[in-house]
Amino acid sequence: MSFFHGVTVTNVDIGARTIALPASSVIGLCDVFTPGAQASAKPNVPVLLTSKKDAAAAFGIGSSIYLACEAIYNRAQAVIVAVGVEAAETPEAQASAVIGGVSAAGERTGLQALLDGKSRFNAQPRLLVAPGHSAQQAVATAMDGLAEKLRAIAILDGPNSTDEAAVAYAKNFGSKRLFMVDPGVQVWDSATNAARKAPASAYAAGLFAWTDAEYGFWSSPSNKEIKGITGTSRPVEFLDGDETCRANLLNNANIATIIRDDGYRLWGNRTLSSDSKWAFVTRVRTMDLVMDAILAGHKWAVDRGITKTYVKDVTEGLRAFMRDLKNQGAVINFEVYADPDLNSASQLAQGKVYWNIRFTDVPPAENPNFRVEVTDQWLTEVLDVA
């Protein structure tokens, strides 16, 4: 029946949708603890942590994984998805436990259990650490693969012995997903009244999270102070303007290090990528977050009818999202458009629509140059008299 006497209200479901950025600094952590009465966590089962108190209750004060959480929370109020594994009898067995896999019961173990972070807690790790264990190539390689799946950065520990050993270790990799820190740090231990050595990766992860909160995910954690340490495992020479100092030699090998300069600072912007396009960790992270935001923000657009309104709504939503990023300072500029060449009649008939999103990210000022000249140009001004 087409006749109706009265008011009709119809929902017109058109218009651009907002696109939200995902959390940039959820930390995925895997380390050792001892199950028992002092620890509520179970081996290989992810736990969501938001404070030292949570970490102590889950893993027990003094466990390796608790100390890693403490290192993170010394700098940032971070969300951590933590997976504890039991101590093994040999280094090889310990590496296998940390790497993890899938058990006979179909449960993920070790680092692989971090993949369950999103389904369990709606928290997808973006920064991965396995403090100390990542100094083993097998563990680092596993972290690289996991980081690729999660669109994350794996923060590796170096061998923590010599600069030469660190450079040699870095040459084993060529991935944009890996960010390596060497040497480790020294931390005061109140239980023993002495300094102890600790891996640097957890401290770097905390600094990444703090930088995200203070400056934005597009900012580098380099040249920012690490809290809670009393020194480094070995001295790292840093002299302003000296290309041959040890800190610069490590950076030249794409290794971040820790320098003492108005406090202890992380020093280095680069991933271990063999592709110069992805040298800066800031570019990798910006691309990851933009891509994931676009993916998550367009579930509504799947299976809608391909009309002019549909193409307009998606395009306007993308432009609004990128405009917001530009206004925040996350990107310099951008362009968004439906691709006229790819969107042929045959492609549209198959339900495929293509948009191009191009943007320029914000690189870190790794090497400001100041050209200073002394000149006699104004010397005769001393003769000027009023």
Swiss-Prot record:
Protein species of origin: Pseudomonas aeruginosa (strain UCBPP-PA14)
Stated family: Belongs to the myoviridae tail sheath protein family.
Primary subcellular site in the record, as a coarse category: secreted
GO cellular component: extracellular region
Alphabetically ordered keywords of this record: Secreted
Localisation per UniProt entry: Secreted
Pfam families the record matches: Gp18_domIII_N (PF22671), Phage_sheath_1 (PF04984), Phage_sheath_1C (PF17482)
InterPro entries, A to Z: Gp18_domIII_N, Phage_sheath_subtilisin, Phage_Tail_Sheath_Structural, Tail_sheath_C
Note: The gene for this protein is encoded in a region with many other potential prophage genes.
Name of the protein described by the UniProt record: Putative prophage major tail sheath protein
